[in-house]
Amino acid sequence: MDEVYLYSDATTSKIARTVTQKLGFSKASSSGTRLHRGYVEEATLEDKPSQTSHIVFVVHGIGQKMDQGRIIKNTAMMREAARKMEEKHFSNHATHVEFLPVEWRSKLTLDGDTVDSITPDKVRGLRDMLNSSAMDIMYYTSPLYRDELVKGLQQELNRLYSLFCSRNPDFEEKGGKVSIVSHSLGCVITYDIMMGWNPGGLYEQLLQKEEELPDERWMSYEERHLLDELYITKRRLREIEDRLHGLKAPSISQTPALKFKVENFFCMGSPLAVFLALRGIRPGNSGSQDHILPREICNRLLNIFHPTDPVAYRLEPLILKHYSNISPVQIHWYNTSNPLPYEHMKPNFLNPAKEPTSVSDSENIAAIPSPVTSPVLSRRHYGESITNIGKASILGAASIGKGLGGMLFSRFGRSSASQPSEPSKDSLEDDKKPSASPSTTTVATQTLPHSGSGFLDSAYFRLQESFFYLPQLLFPENVMQSKDDSLVELEHRIDFELREGLVESRYWSAVTSHTAYWSSLDVALFLLTFMYKHEHDTEAKPSLGSL
């Protein structure tokens, strides 16, 4: 065979071939494309595909059983958005970032079809949707099925990493990095895998503490003596067990949960902060990410959320409490020209300070903690989030209640003081005495009727004092914090907030925002910014050292 032609099966091509053949032209020369051996242009070394220097495992949340394969479609949308941003902003890099979906839900057995068998038939569609989505949260909080979910995701992550390394043998040798992007409940499961969190061990410790604190009110002297001996024996046994464990520790090395170290952990629409708060994690005073996720496990933790996402919560106030009054970092629009780097953005207040109208207002404003060099600016996006509106309403209700309470007690005090009574000599002498120094503040209270010593007044102030010390009684470990804790800044910002649209409806976005991260170009550019930042820092180190 000397010549090979390629023909099209389109209808127009067939009509053209028929007409040209009837006119006397050959079939090959009329509508076909002749194929030749060889190549048109010689290939070069630069024509090879770019090397993968960073892989990103994309972990889904709830609802995967309802729509199997959805994580593959979502990852494809995120990969496509990342490719557009790479071509626009990172075209000078010889490497690229690869996104790999992690589908862990379909392989789990859990309760089988038990929940489906007990589901009523009325409104079956809605019930099936809830069983396929929200039921995953109940499975994870169940002590019976939690381990199955954790092991399912852990094994799938390790399997995909081993498979990728087998097909790319030089990935680890050339220092390839691994990051994880988790969504919704997947953030909590991924966090527990990295931290090795075991609620069973904590429950055993709680039971052990309860056993060590029996009721000694009705014990006799002999019973208390035997109980003391039992405590000493248990303490001695615990010391021997610790020594034995210390001897076995060098020979037994604990296998890490993951076969790789996580460079960046991106949480999207994450309820992780709620789970950590319910587990007893309280704000500290260090300002470091190690308070919730040590650097030895993950180099960087970043929390991405939409302002109206009802499932997402902030993580920064769990590290430093006063960051609840500081707005999250606004994520740049993908088409912003010359955006300010995120590490150079200064914290902004959520509620700008107003001019004090009274002494109490000025004290409250002065007591608002803020980092050093933090400008008091309004939020740089259109409108406030629903969370801020709710917070403002709660604070407003509290201030109204406080004002009504003060008016009530002051009114009650005036009515009691209106009764005629002659001032005593002691009181007149006290009036002639010089007033206290300005540095001290005195509270003048009037005696209520039938209370010679001001019983109701003292009860009122004791009630206020008890409410002031209530958090100290509940969480005594967080009481001894210095007044300078409000001046501590975070080492790195963790909470990053997407910008709201100009004509975006908050009620509609509250329904759609939880699943709007996958196709967002802003999110794709944000992810690539932090992934390529490591390569830029690595390349800049030798030049800085030479200087």
UniProtKB/Swiss-Prot annotation:
GO terms for cellular component: cytoplasm. InterPro entries: DDHD_dom. Residues 435-448 have a biased composition (Low complexity). The modification Phosphoserine is found at S370. Predominantly expressed in testis, in round and elongating spermatids, but not in spermatocytes (at protein level). Also expressed in the brain, and at lower levels in other tissues such as thymus and lung (at protein level). Its EC number is 3.1.1.111, 3.1.1.32, 3.1.1.118. It holds the Pfam family DDHD. The active site is at S184. It is an enzyme of class 3 (hydrolase). Belongs to the PA-PLA1 family. Forms homooligomers and, to a much smaller extent, heterooligomers with DDHD2. Interacts with SEC23A and SEC24C. This is Phospholipase DDHD1. The gene is Ddhd1.
